[in-house]
């Protein structure tokens, strides 16, 4: 087992539903520790930069518009196999295909408003965490 970090974003739809605490409880119940966290209202520039990997995809503009539509809760999570564990907690990107009991099955409205973002690999997680938490403000506990 490998202790690793992953980035999680609770998206504007889930923040608006006031389910941050319920989502955090799921992280902690799965053995993931929140090692950095902040609430932010992303600018268009920040959202475009963060999701730049998708810039040529047809959904890019809608994704950026959604991510700047309200505040988001951004956290770095740490634990055994954190990337996979978080992805299992999130469920399928399309909440209609997400397994019952996953975050997206329980809190997401659509494939666009799908409640959460999670890093897809440890390497991606390192880049994503550095994007939102540059410097020395991520603390193991």
UniProtKB/Swiss-Prot annotation:
Subunit relationships: Homotetramer.
Active site: 117 (pros-phosphohistidine intermediate)
Protein name from the UniProt record: Nucleoside diphosphate kinase
Subcellular location: Cytoplasm
One Pfam family this sequence matches: NDK
Annotated GO MF terms: ATP binding; metal ion binding; nucleoside diphosphate kinase activity
Keyword entries, A-Z: ATP-binding, Cytoplasm, Kinase, Magnesium, Metal-binding, Nucleotide metabolism, Nucleotide-binding, Phosphoprotein, Transferase
Classification via CDD domains: NDPk_I
Cofactor entry: Mg(2+)
Catalytic activity as recorded in UniProt: a 2'-deoxyribonucleoside 5'-diphosphate + ATP = a 2'-deoxyribonucleoside 5'-triphosphate + ADP; a ribonucleoside 5'-diphosphate + ATP = a ribonucleoside 5'-triphosphate + ADP
Gene3D superfamilies recorded: Nucleoside diphosphate kinase-like domain
